[in-house]
Amino acid sequence: MTGMPQTPLLDRVNFPSDLKEIDDRDLPELARELRDEMIDAVSKTGGHLGAGLGVVELTIAIHKVFNTPEDRLIFDVGHQCYPHKILTGRRDRIRTLRQEDGLSGFTRRAESEYDDFGAGHSSTSISAGLGMAVAAGLDGSDRKVIAVIGDGSMSAGMAFEALNNAGALDARLIVILNDNDMSIAPPTGAMSAYLARLASGRTYMGFRDFGKKLTAYLGKTIDRAITRAVTHARGYVTGGTLFEELGFYHIGPIDGHSFDHLLPVLRNVRDNQKGPVLIHVVTQKGKGYAPAEAAADKYHGVNKFDVITGAQAKAKPNAPSYTSVFAEALIQEATLDEKIIGVTAAMPNGTGLDKMAELFPSRTFDVGIAEQHAVTFAAGLAADGYKPFCALYSTFLQRGYDQLVHDVAIQSLPVRFPIDRAGFVGADGPTHAGSFDTTFLATLPGMVVMAAADEAELKHMVRTAAAYDEGPISFRYPRGEGVGVEMPARGEILQIGKGRIIKEGTKVALLSFGTRLAECLAAAEDLDAAGLSTTVADARFAKPLDLDLIRQLAAHHEVLVTIEEGSVGGFGAHVLHFMASAGLLDHGPKVRTLTLPDQWVEQAKPETMYANAGLDRAGIVSTVFNALGQRQAGVGFAG
């Protein structure tokens, strides 16, 4: 493939209604063109390629059979939504995916009327779809609701909560289980296609409906006999399943890359749906692009790449990543302490725990997309004397917050929480930003909340957490490379609740929590040059605060600025609360708090996002000058 792909069929499709004019026999060629278009686009932007390649035929079939956007279509997580975006009026912008001011990498209601529900986190589609199905019933509408969910997302309890509720309500909901687990072989041959058509057709569904109506007039004994007969007949077609027990009519598995399988089943379900239906579709992640099919991760998330070779463009790192530093430090501690356990929720590669699993497989647990379970599982380990490190992305820790409060914090169980992807994450936008962890953790009694200023500090915090047994403790760190500081052979145990002064001055104090420390030091150079002698301190802890350090900074400086990569209500708010309670604001310094802005910040390069938020060198300098009432060009969000 060289240059722009040739796509004569795809050129005829601007919106799903155009698919109605394309003959079924031409759909395989349309699928090939759609794959070529998506591969070319993602090669220029980077993104989640493998999932979208796996659902090309399924996406075409859904939009051809159903009447979107009147019929509702929800994609779980959203990694697989790129073909959907191309088919729904956004092809001309597909090469802006995940770029500043470009298309989101996920479905977004504000972006298109075809995006019925926003996504980013997993396992939400069935719940949202059920709500829409009930709304359709209340409206007296015949619109259909289709939720597409991957087999990985089915590991979350929320998906089963929704299935259970949908079955109990007998709702008119279509769930398509996109099974791309390569351990499950796709069905092949005419017989499986025939059985799927039979199972979804009028004959069997009518028989089942007749059986339900008949049992309403008969006694329990005959009722049970008829129910067994209907179930037995169903078993001849595809066999009983857990989904049947939950009240769903189950069809499949069927080949998700065969229009001969997909179209008749979807048409039957569209025309005959009585209650909740689950269609089990087997697909191959990365389908149609050899480098993706051959890769272990099926090109789940990729950088820009060469379409011919599949080689990804990766800049040579200047310093080790925070994730790799965490993983190596944890392995070092685990080698010395057999009580240390690693726990993650479907992100072993992303959190670095895959490295620990190679050395300590019996002490490393990937519990699937199940953050609630991960937190309480870790609490159980801690209750019996182990030292669990429950490593989660900041944005996903939100999903386990009740468990963190109820099962960990109230019981003062020493669960360690390494929090990756703290702060802005760039191209994945607001659904994946690590904005809120400091705010929701520091409010909990007995919680220790740390943030690493650089990769050496991260190593200290891993060892500190390993040694701390008094209760729960967390430490946050961002995505990407470290600063490039000299690394200790092993981390030191930090004194809980004590920060450090990096540079001493007399007029301005910059109190940093997290990796904005480097920007604070750069800002201090500019302030010193302007005659404003500046102190720079690293708080290390948002809870417990270093009260002596805050008193010292307040007593000896005219301006005190707190800087953090978190939302309003976090570190700066706790500093202000203490200062107000201690009377340090009565006649003390001018205090300013720099946080992430109180708005959903859209995708861009992280450095751009921080600059726009006023959390870079220029923004810090501007804040100081404004506090002093001196004129200085400002940088930051308006309003």
UniProtKB/Swiss-Prot annotation:
The keyword DNA repair does not apply. Its cofactor is Mg(2+); thiamine diphosphate. GO terms for molecular function: 1-deoxy-D-xylulose-5-phosphate synthase activity; magnesium ion binding; thiamine pyrophosphate binding. Its EC number is 2.2.1.7. Homodimer. This is 1-deoxy-D-xylulose-5-phosphate synthase. Binds 1 Mg(2+) ion per subunit. Pfam families: DXP_synthase_N, Transket_pyr, Transketolase_C. Thiamine diphosphate binds at residues 79, 120-122, 152-153, 180, 289, 371. The gene is dxs. SUPFAM superfamilies: Thiamin diphosphate-binding fold (THDP-binding), TK C-terminal domain-like. GO terms for biological process: 1-deoxy-D-xylulose 5-phosphate biosynthetic process; glyceraldehyde-3-phosphate metabolic process; terpenoid biosynthetic process; thiamine biosynthetic process. Keywords: Isoprene biosynthesis, Magnesium, Metal-binding, Thiamine biosynthesis, Thiamine pyrophosphate, Transferase. Mg(2+) binds at residues 151, 180. Catalyzes the acyloin condensation reaction between C atoms 2 and 3 of pyruvate and glyceraldehyde 3-phosphate to yield 1-deoxy-D-xylulose-5-phosphate (DXP). PANTHER family: 1-D-DEOXYXYLULOSE 5-PHOSPHATE SYNTHASE-RELATED, 1-DEOXY-D-XYLULOSE-5-PHOSPHATE SYNTHASE, CHLOROPLASTIC. Gene3D superfamilies: 3.40.50.920, 3.40.50.970. Belongs to the transketolase family. DXPS subfamily. Disulfide bonds: none annotated.
